[in-house]
Amino acid sequence: MQLQSPFGDGISCECLNIRVLGIPNETKHQWIFVPRDLIKIKIYSLLQICKAENCSAVACRGCNLCILAVQGNIEISEEPQKLFQEENVKVYIYDSAISLSSVRASFPISELGIRMDIIKARAEPREDEIRASFSSLVNKEIKRTVEELLLSKRSTNRLSLLAFMRNQQLNYEAYETKLLEDASTIEKSLEKEVKTIYDSNIASPKESSDAIDADHAMIDESRSTQRRKSKPKKHVAFTDEYQVAFSDKPGKYFNQPMQYSKQFKLDNPDYEASSDSLNDIENLSTLTFRSDEELEFDFDTNNINNNKSGDSLEMSTTIPSDEENEDFTSKVDAMEIHSGSLPLNIDSSPIFTNHSPSSSLSSESSFEASPSSFVDRKNRWIQMLKKADEHSRSIQARSMGYVLSDDLDNSKAFRPYKQSFLAQGWKSLN
């Protein structure tokens, strides 16, 4: 049943302690459904319930009036809000119920909304009951207010927390960006420093090698000058065939002596080989030396002839004319033995001695060596070549980073393989 009356109309007891709002006078002697919130009880301690058949009568001890009955059995509990369990309560209105509007218009009402004169005349309530009733009402309002405050505070705290977290995130992103910039700056500076050190390490050996090459060039130039001023060499002591390196410039050596190699063309881009020089090199490549037995035999024969006839001693070794001697001497001065990275000049060997410039061996003084000395000199020369070859191979092996047994035994400046590779080998890879 819908309530057509406006809010404020209803029924009440005589002291206004129990009220049912929104109920007009025409609803008496009827069972109607009333929302639980419209049943108001001011002083809960003045409430009295009388149980009947299938219903419970609600009365007020202040005015001793029973104005309504509730369907079902109800119990007085400590909390007034638990008096009615259902949202819509089915009630029956008695004739003793007074219209609420008439009571408010006829009698004075206290600040509590009840008629205190009737309550004092009929039944004086105890102070503790009144205090408990009011405390329940106040506590309800306080609880509602506190919940509202907590909700508002919680929302405020949530917003402030979000703002704080957003600020922290911005600070962290700024710190991370600055840290990355510092790291990139340090990395660039380190790369620049490493590149500078690497360039200086490459440049310093180059400068030292240039200085060494300049010193070698000066030494070779002085040696070539000495060779031009010295007496011509006309005798070769060893008898095996050797390849002789030819070079117009002293101090240059080639792996293929009888040809103009690629290295020679790179070192001498302006040099153009003439047909005469090529012919001379071809003629020089066919130069051979006689064996020990032939030299010995010629030497003995000449000695015998000298004893018999007393003529000048002449060896059977073919000696060219004066013009050919000068040409051959100039070429011999330019010839050098190439062995790895350690060059050896022919004139540095003890095989060549200062002889007289005569074109023939006219006396014993011009040929001081015995036949056995030729063999000794040849053996010494071969040993020198072997040592030079071993020396060049050891230098090449050290440059590649290997550690030789001689370095372990004799070298004081021993460096392990890893250190040698880091010092020399890795530069060649780059």
Curated annotation (Swiss-Prot):
Signal peptide region: none
Key words, A-Z: Cell cycle, Cytoplasm, Meiosis, Phosphoprotein, Sporulation
GO biological process: meiotic cell cycle; sporulation resulting in formation of a cellular spore; TORC1 signaling
UniProt GO cellular component terms: cytosol; TORC1 complex
UniProt subcellular location: Cytoplasm
The organism's place on the tree of life at top rank: Eukaryota
Main location class: cytoplasm
Coiled-coil segments on the chain, per record: none
Cell cycle is among the record's keywords: yes
Phosphoserine PTM sites in chain numbering: S204, S399
Role description: Component of TORC1, which regulates multiple cellular processes to control cell growth in response to environmental signals. Tor2 is essential for growth. Nutrient limitation and environmental stress signals cause inactivation of TORC1. Active TORC1 positively controls cell growth and ribosome biogenesis by regulating ribosomal protein gene expression. TORC1 negatively controls G1 cell-cycle arrest, sexual development and amino acid uptake.
Complex formation: The target of rapamycin complex 1 (TORC1) is composed of at least mip1, pop3/wat1, tco89, toc1 and tor2.
Protein name as catalogued: Target of rapamycin complex 1 subunit toc1
Organism: Schizosaccharomyces pombe (strain 972 / ATCC 24843) (Fission yeast)
Gene that encodes it: toc1
